């Protein structure tokens, strides 16, 4: 496994791989890798000849400076995990390598609509930062496929739209959420939880299951369903942030013709803002 930190060296290897006709997969990450990331790596390895994993804590997508400062940086441990998985390349650039002129005045990629709705409404600029760094990684690594987790449901939808709108010839692969045995979705931010909070954390998934059961049963009183769910979360020790029930294919409001719904949930538990989602097939 080769660790690349500079753009000239990256470009040198990309040129060689292209000349050799290799099929390249990219797994973009911000590090602090867990089993969910490893599932992305496994999917990439199954679909390509060469796998790149990028590790870059992207300052452009953080809406709160304190969150950027305390985001876990575990490059050595991450590389050890990836080496055991037989990843070919790790691209781990410094911020100055990606944004040599700084963030102010940086050209960016913005995806209208999807970047400012739902999660984007509560985190201004977040998705603009995501789409910009993913676009830069696509330009630099020129992958044939890229793997993203379905835990970040809106992010995956945004990247699919960006790829379509910008005419990237890249297959986007969504990989299902990986959960702990108690149902908690794996996330780098789970490391913010205390031992006591970790015991409470699966409650978010349990509340989503309750919402899903109501939708499957034909209940469409969405405001009431959401209000009850928020109350349940608060009673469990969470601070409910946002719960939405949307059309899984458009992320717009549910209509009578919607075939699938997605439950999008975000809640604070101590210093950790946990997000999760669950798709539901609706009775027609």
Swiss-Prot record:
Its EC number is 6.3.2.1. It catalyses: (R)-pantoate + beta-alanine + ATP = (R)-pantothenate + AMP + diphosphate + H(+). GO terms for molecular function: ATP binding; pantoate-beta-alanine ligase activity. It holds the Pfam family Pantoate_ligase. GO terms for cellular component: cytosol. The active site is at residue 37. ATP binds at residues 30-37, 149-152, 178, 186-189. (R)-pantoate binds at residues 61, 155. Keywords: ATP-binding, Cytoplasm, Ligase, Nucleotide-binding, Pantothenate biosynthesis. The keyword Transit peptide does not apply. GO terms for biological process: pantothenate biosynthetic process. InterPro entries: Pantoate_ligase, Pantoate_ligase_C, Rossmann-like_a/b/a_fold. Pathway: Cofactor biosynthesis; (R)-pantothenate biosynthesis; (R)-pantothenate from (R)-pantoate and beta-alanine: step 1/1. Homodimer. HAMAP family: PanC (MF_00158). Belongs to the pantothenate synthetase family. This is Pantothenate synthetase. It comes from Salmonella paratyphi B (strain ATCC BAA-1250 / SPB7).
């Amino acid at each position: 496994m080769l660790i690349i930190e500079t753009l000239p060296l990256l470009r040198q290897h990309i040129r060689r791989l292209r000349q050799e006709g290799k099929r390249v997969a990219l797994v973009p990450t911000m590090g602090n890798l867990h089993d969910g990331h490893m599932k992305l790596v496994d999917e990439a390895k199954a679909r390509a000849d060469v796998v790149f994993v990028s590790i870059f804590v992207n300052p452009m997508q953080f809406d709160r400076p304190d969150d950027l400062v305390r985001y876990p940086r575990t490059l050595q441990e991450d590389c050890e995990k990836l080496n055991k998985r037989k990843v070919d390349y790790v691209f781990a650039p410094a911020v100055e390598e990606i944004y040599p002129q700084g963030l102010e005045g940086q050209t960016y990629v913005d995806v209208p609509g999807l970047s400012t709705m739902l999660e984007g409404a509560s985190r201004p600029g977040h998705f603009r930062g995501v789409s910009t760094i993913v676009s830069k990684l696509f330009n630099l690594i020129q992958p044939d496929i890229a793997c993203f987790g379905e835990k970040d449901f809106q992010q995956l939808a945004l990247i699919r739209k960006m790829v379509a709108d910008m005419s990237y010839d890249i297959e986007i692969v969504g990989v299902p959420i990986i959960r702990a045995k108690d149902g908690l979705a794996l996330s780098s931010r789970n490391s913010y939880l205390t031992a006591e909070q970790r015991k409470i954390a699966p409650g978010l998934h349990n509340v989503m299951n309750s919402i899903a059961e109501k939708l499957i049963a034909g209940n469409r009183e969405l405001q009431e369903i959401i209000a009850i769910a928020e109350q349940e979360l608060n009673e469990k020790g969470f601070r409910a942030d946002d719960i939405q029930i949307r059309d899984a294919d458009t992320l717009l409001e549910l209509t009578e013709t919607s075939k699938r719904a997605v439950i999008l949930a975000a809640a604070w538990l101590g210093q950790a803002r946990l997000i999760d989602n669950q798709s539901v097939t609706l009775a027609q």
